[in-house]
C-alpha cells in the first residue's frame, strides 16, 4: 500500500499537483513508520543487528566506525547506477534512511541526495525505534488500517 501512495505522489509531483503529492507522500511515510516499528519486533529485521555485527568486528574506534560505514554502504548506495541494489526492508533502515531520502527527493534539494546518503553512511547510527508492545496486535491493526 505504501508503494501505491509513493507512486501516486511521484505522479502528482510530475504533474505539479503539490497538495496531492504532499498528501500521498505523508500517507507513504505514515505506513512506512508503522512497518518500521513492526519490524523492530524481530531481531532478523533490524538494522541494529547489522551495525552491531560490523562494529564488533573492529578493535579500535576508527576500525569500528569504518566497518559500520562499510556495512551501511553495502545495503544502501553500493552498486553504483543500480540504485538500492542490496536494499533491505529493516527497521531502522526504513525510518532513518529510506524515509528521509524519500522526503528529500520531494524537496527542491534533490541534487543533495547523494551528499545526504554519504553523510548518513559515515555517521555513527543508533537505534531510535521502539517496537510495538504486542507485534501481532499491531500487525492486525496495520492490516485493518491499510484495507480501508
Which positions does each model-derived feature cover?
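Catalytic domains of carbohydrate-active enzymes that cleave complex glycans
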Residues: 1-148
